[in-house]
Curated annotation (Swiss-Prot):
One GO cellular component term noted in the UniProt record for this chain: cytosol
Binding annotation for Zn(2+) 2: 140, 174, 379
Record Gene3D superfamilies: 3.30.70.360, Zn peptidases (3.40.630.10)
Name by which UniProt lists this protein: Peptidase T
InterPro entries for this protein: ArgE/DapE_CS, Bact_exopeptidase_dim_dom, Peptidase_M20, Peptidase_M20_dimer, Peptidase_M20B
Subcellular localization: Cytoplasm
Function, in words: Cleaves the N-terminal amino acid of tripeptides.
GO biological process terms, semicolon-separated: peptide catabolic process; proteolysis
Similarity comment: Belongs to the peptidase M20B family.
E.C. number(s) listed in UniProt: 3.4.11.4
Keyword Hydrolase (UniProt): yes
C-alpha cells in the first residue's frame, strides 16, 4: 500500500459514516477503527509523536530536514463520511482514460452523466474513481487523508527541504463536531490547511455561518367528525411555518454568496410534529436575521393556540465564517496561492458553501484555510474523484512545505 491510489482505496473500505444527534465523539465505532489503522500506518512510516486521543483524533509529526528555524505548519483531513448516504461496503470503480459520455455505476440504472455533471467534459483522458451507484465514495474526505499521508511519505523519502509538519485526522466533521475536541495547543502548528475541498485549484478561506433549527409542534387530535374548533393539526401548523419561508431561498435555488433555509426532515402526526432545518448565510448580519425570521414565523403561527398546544423552537449555532480570522494572516493564503501557481494550477478562490474543521479551528487560534482534493459531487452516489487531481493535491501540499522552509531561510 505504497501509492496514492492504494491508500485511498484502503481508506474507503472502512465504514466511517458519522451519526448526528449522538453525544459521544466519535459518533460511530467505524471511525475509531480507521483511526487505529492510521495510527499504525503513521508509526510504520516512521513519523514521530504519533497519538490517538480518546475522541479519535490522530496526530503525528514529520520532523524538519533543515537546520534553520521554520514555522511548524499542519495539514488536516477528516475520517468520517456524511450521514446523507451509506458508506458501508463501498465498491469503487476505476475508469482509466475517460473518453467522455455516460459512465455506468455498477449493474443497475445509475449513471454518471456529463449532461447532469458538465465538469466531466473537462476531465477527458483522466482516471476517474466512481461509486457503484449504491453508496457514496468517501472522497470527502478520505482523499484528503490519502493525499496528506502520501505527501508526508514523499517528503520523508525525498530531498525537498521542509520544516516540522504536523498532521491530524479528525472524526465527526460531517456532523459539526470535528474540531470540538481538537487540542490546538498539542497540535502545535502556527497555521494549518484542511485538505477537504473539491475540484483542482479550489482555495477557500471563507465559509457559511451555520445553525440548526429544531421545531417541535404539539397539536390536539380528536375525531375528525367532531373536530371543529377543537382539533389542532400539528402537521398543518408545520406546513404553515414552511410556507411562510422565502420559497426561493433554498439550496437548490441558491449559489455563490446566497444563503438559504433548508428543511432537512419533517415527521409527525396530528398530535405532534417535528421539523429540522439548517440555516446558512455568509454575512453575520444575514445569519442573525435568518434565525430571527424563523423565530418570528413560529411565534406568528403559534398565536392563539390552546395553552396545551404550542410551538417550541431550539436554535443551535454550528460554526461561523472563518473569513475575518484567516484575513488576519494573509501570508497563509498567499503561500497556498503561490504553491498552486508554481505548479501551473490556477487558484480558484471561492466561498465554501458548507463548513470545514478549519472554520472552527480558525476561531481557536489555528488559522486554517481549505485546499482542494480533486473530488466532485460529495455526499452521494454520484461522488467521484480523479487520480490526476489527487496527485496535484499531493504536489501542492509538498510545495507549501517547501515554500514555508524557503521563506523562513530568506527571512532568517
Amino acid at each position: 500500500m505504497n501509492n496514492l491510489l492504494d491508500r485511498f482505496l484502503n481508506y474507503v473500505s472502512f465504514d466511517t459514516q458519522s451519526k448526528p444527534g449522538v453525544r459521544q465523539v466519535p459518533s460511530t465505532e467505524g471511525q475509531f477503527r480507521l483511526a487505529r489503522a492510521l495510527q499504525s500506518e503513521l508509526l510504520a512510516l516512521g513519523l514521530e509523536q504519533v497519538t490517538l486521543s480518546e475522541h479519535g483524533c490522530v496526530m503525528a509529526t514529520l520532523p524538519a530536514n533543515v537546520a534553520w528555524p521554520v514555522p511548524t505548519i499542519g495539514f488536516i483531513a477528516h475520517m468520517d463520511t456524511a450521514p446523507d448516504a451509506s458508506g458501508k461496503n463501498v465498491n469503487p470503480q476505476i475508469v482509466e482514460n475517460y473518453r467522455g459520455g455516460d459512465i455506468a455505476l455498477g449493474i443497475g440504472d445509475e449513471i454518471l452523466s456529463p449532461v447532469m455533471f458538465p465538469v466531466l467534459h473537462q476531465l477527458l483522458g483522466q482516471t476517474l474513481i466512481t461509486t457503484d451507484g449504491k453508496t457514496l465514495l468517501g472522497a470527502d474526505d478520505k482523499s484528503g487523508i490519502a493525499e496528506i499521508m502520501t505527501a508526508m511519505v514523499r517528503l520523508k523519502q525525498g530531498n525537498t527541504p521542509h520544516g516540522e509538519i504536523r498532521v491530524a485526522f479528525t472524526p465527526d466533521e460531517e456532523v459539526g463536531k470535528g474540531a470540538q475536541h481538537f487540542d490546538v495547543a498539542a497540535f502545535g502548528a502556527e497555521w494549518a490547511y484542511t485538505v477537504d475541498g473539491g475540484g483542482v485549484g479550489e482555495l477557500e478561506c471563507e465559509n457559511f455561518n451555520a445553525a440548526s433549527v429544531n421545531i417541535k409542534i404539539i397539536g390536539n387530535n380528536v375525531h375528525p367528525g367532531s373536530a371543529k374548533g377543537v382539533m389542532v393539526n400539528a402537521l398543518g401548523l408545520a406546513n404553515r411555518i414552511h410556507a411562510l419561508l422565502p420559497a426561493a431561498e433554498v439550496p437548490e435555488q441558491t449559489d455563490g454568496y446566497e444563503g438559504f433555509y433548508h428543511l432537512v426532515s419533517m415527521k409527525g402526526s396530528v398530535e405532534k410534529a417535528e421539523m429540522h432545518y439548517i440555516v446558512r448565510d455568509f454575512s453575520r448580519e444575514g445569519f442573525e436575521a435568518r434565525k430571527k425570521h424563523m423565530m418570528a414565523i413560529a411565534k406568528q403561527v403559534g398565536q392563539g393556540l390552546h395553552p396545551d398546544c404550542y410551538i417550541e423552537v431550539t436554535l443551535d449555532d454550528s460554526y461561523y465564517n472563518m473569513r475575518d480570522e484567516v484575513a488576519k494572516h494573509p501570508h497563509i493564503v498567499a503561500l497556498a496561492r503561490q504553491a498552486m501557481c508554481d505548479l501551473a494550477i490556477e487558484p480558484i478562490e471561492r466561498p465554501i458553501r458548507g463548513g470545514t474543521d478549519g472554520a472552527q479551528l480558525s476561531f481557536h487560534g489555528l488559522p486554517c484555510p481549505n485546499l482542494f482534493t480533486g473530488g466532485y459531487n460529495f455526499h452521494g452516489k454520484h461522488e467521484f474523484i480523479t487520480l490526476e487531481g489527487m496527485e496535484k493535491a499531493v504536489s501542492v501540499i509538498m510545495r507549501i512545505a517547501e515554500l514555508t522552509a524557503g521563506r523562513a531561510r530568506v527571512a532568517g
